[in-house]
Amino acid sequence: MASPQGGYPPQEGYGQQPVAYGAPVQQPGEAPAPQVHTGGRKKRAYAGEAFEIGSGANAALGGQPPAGGAYGAYPPQQPAYGADPSQMAQGYAPPVAPGVAQMTQQFGAMGVTDPHLMPPQQAPQAPQAPQAPRAVPLNQLYPTDLLTQPFNVAELDYPPPPIVLAPGTSVYPSPYANCPPKYVRSTLNAVPTTHSLLKKSKLPFALVIQPYAALHDAEDQVPVIPDQVISRCRRCRSYINPFVTFLDHGHRWRCNMCNLTNDVPQAFDWDATLQKPADRALRPDLNHAVVEFVAPQEYMVRPPQPLVYLFLIDVSYASVTNGLLATSARCIKESLDRIPNADRRTRLGFIAVDSSLHYFSIPRDGSETSDPRMLVVSDLDEPFLPIPGDLLVTLSECRENIEVFLDKLQEMFQNTQNNSCAMGSALRAGYKLISPVGGKMTVLTSSLPNVGHGALTMREDKKVLGTSKESSLLQTANSFYKSFAVECSKAQVSVDMFLFSSQYQDVASLSNLPRYTGGQTYFYPGWNAARSEDAIKFAREFSDYLSSEIGLEAVLRVRATTGLRMSTFYGNFFNRSSDLCAFPAFPRDQAYVVEVAIDETVTKPVVCLQTAVLHTTCNGERRIRVLTLALPTTQNLADVYASADQQAIATFFSHKAVERTLGSGLEQAREALQAKAVELLSTYRKELAGGSVGGGGLQFPANLRGLPVLFLALIKNLGLRKSAQIPTDMRSAALCLLSTLPLPLLIQYIYPKMYSLHDMPDNAGLPDEQTGEIVLPPPINLSSERIVPYGLYLIDDGQTQFLWVGRDAVPQLLLDVFGLPDRSQLRVGKQNLPELDNDFNGRVRAVVEKSRDHRSKGVGSIVVPHLYVVKEDGEPGLRLWAQTMLVEDRADQGVSLVQWMGSLREKV
């Protein structure tokens, strides 16, 4: 089987054993090499021939280093480091992170509980009268040496540095007053008061915003304020929030953004449902940083839009033969009950596309005929609507006949020989059909649009891959896709692309439509419904896609304290004005990045940044979701570094790198990332580590130790890495992910998770006693050094999973996991694990499934990763693809982590 990467040629350097930075080969936290058993210790079933308990990556539960080898352990003076209780409810009591064992003992002696479980700050007390908050000490800076204390993957699971606010900062002492990191994360949790200090730090100041943490409201409920009493500042239009102050016996409030004094609305303290006075201290908008207001009439330009899905389905030869037409028709039919339709206004339409456009008029249920009528239009230059009505039908009124139509759709085109695809003209026609109401055009296609509007040609050239000319292939080939996207955005039309080609499809051009309309590009390379794994993956994902409670006709704006300005916005939307982002549809599985400029000196001890998303719910209600984040300010560079969030910074630079790739080229994007890593290390060394460090170390704060590793992993990601083997479509699809994924999924896509399964702890793969969630084994570093030849490993980047089977895996392990007595019978490639009647099989399947669980990561996503079984001595293309996930190794044209740290050390 050819690997989806086009089959990497074996490169030198694969599987090399890099030496730990200036240390013996055995990494701290890794058990000694397996010895032949002496018969004296208890052995695992799979280990009879090979190893004893107490060896392998999980030997010390969590790769605990020997005493004294504490990597990035935060010293005990700072019990609050990053402890956000909500972050920690990730389905298991947090694994004892490397080096935290010593901390825990010291805390125990001090009478302090586990540092990971302490609240980030004391709940502020309600002020009797407005008072200036006292200055409180911010996070302390803990320098570490990146060369003598190598990075441990568990550090990526630490929460961000806590936001330290003085007591009394919020109007009421609510634990929910500040925005949780799953919705908004700042790259800096202590904000410089001046532009010059920010510039000196060389750190970016940006927000990573993910307004929704799940595809459905029920999975992530936020307080809804139904009374339509929305109090906003008259000058800056900020919404009242937990950080305002009340004056004049509570009759007026001072805006925490611009300081203007506003009147409190009369109805603010009145409970309209109970018709009696209400306690202001219980109002959600004064206690919760994340709330949703039901909007009154003045927030609507027109009646709320209904949910509209127009399906543009490719019915050319490629799409019929690979099973896309049949699978998508069946999947839509089976998902009709999942499409949101509480207000019974949801409308659907269908256009089939080959060298002509085929419209379908579907009669209402109970009409004389139930048969759909097909109307064919072959004028591709000026596509017209053959009949104005009946092409968009109401789901509730035509439910049965929509099913009749979907059953017949496949038969209509089953014998086609038509190789043309006029998808550009179909998009134009679809726009004509739904632009009066707005809605979503969902494109399902297996072909390159080769006739009509926006026709594209095969432009991939193997000879330019890996050269400077490759970057031109990542740009749009036809201006239609950008200009048409802007038209769509103005008419509240959003486009989603589901692409299934086995040949070049020009993802680079097609992905512009989702990019500017708040949509997404979903890419299924080499997909074929005859492979059950392919059919099941698409069916599950498409059904979740249709069920998602998207927002409609939405706009997003971020306001902030005087002195701060939103300068640049990144993500899939159209930037309508300097600070307004327009979304014809607002998805729930994407994040956005907003860069913040400091225009004038900030004089306040706390700044606030407030994100507001005005949208129509898919049930026809106009709402505003408001997310308010308060951050302390500082004039001290050490505070800025000590409170910087490495994952948010990596997310910001991921978006920057995609922008640079599309603007200047791949090489420039990679060089900019390396230059940034050097600049940050040099700045820290010069400004905060006293200029010169004895012994040639590489100093960086404990909270940023993962940043150089994340930069290397980003440079080696499919979207950016230097290689002559990566098909352009694969690269373009990866760039789409790097610029849209929610933060937890993006970090995993850049630095995948790897779990050792053959020696996982006894509780892994079983439900946790407290939470009932499946316990995952501790993750291990992405280095071939961590892989033993008799091992079984799961490697998961959130899009693809690999189950790596070592060449010396013992027969009992293969029997328990795969039900096969002999290694030679093990099939490699895409598959699902068999369900066998033994405990270990159940635990391995539970770990594979739990690793896919988006909800426990606090994000919405439709993706169900494929699982590939890889034999260490099996199919080379597949093996090399899996090995590209080991970002700490040397591979293809990329350096190892040891080489990378060495080169950074030289440049710093």
From Swiss-Prot:
One of its GO terms (cellular component) is endoplasmic reticulum exit site. It is a peripheral membrane protein. It comes from the Eukaryota. Residues 1-43 are annotated as: Disordered. InterPro entries: ADF-H/Gelsolin-like_dom_sf (IPR029006), Gelsolin-like_dom (IPR007123), Gelsolin-like_dom_sf (IPR036180), Sec23/24_helical_dom (IPR006900), Sec23/24_helical_dom_sf (IPR036175), Sec23/24_trunk_dom (IPR006896), Sec23_24_beta_S (IPR012990), SEC23_SEC24_subfamily (IPR050550). One of its GO terms (biological process) is COPII-coated vesicle cargo loading. It is found in: Cytoplasm; Cytoplasmic vesicle, COPII-coated vesicle membrane; Endoplasmic reticulum membrane; Golgi apparatus membrane. GO terms for molecular function: SNARE binding; zinc ion binding. Zn(2+) binds at residues 233, 236, 255, 258. Gene3D superfamilies: beta-sandwich domain of Sec23/24, Sec23/Sec24 helical domain, Severin, von Willebrand factor, type A domain, Zn-finger domain of Sec23/24. Residues 1-18 have a biased composition (Low complexity). Residues 233-258 are annotated as: Zinc finger-like. Its main location: cytoplasm. Keywords: Cytoplasm, Cytoplasmic vesicle, Endoplasmic reticulum, ER-Golgi transport, Golgi apparatus, Membrane, Metal-binding, Protein transport, Transport, Zinc. The COPII coat is composed of at least 5 proteins: the sec23/24 complex, the sec13/31 complex, and the protein sar1. Golgi apparatus membrane; Peripheral membrane protein; Cytoplasmic side. Belongs to the SEC23/SEC24 family. SEC24 subfamily. Component of the coat protein complex II (COPII) which promotes the formation of transport vesicles from the endoplasmic reticulum (ER). The coat has two main functions, the physical deformation of the endoplasmic reticulum membrane into vesicles and the selection of cargo molecules. This is Protein transport protein sec24. The gene is sec24.
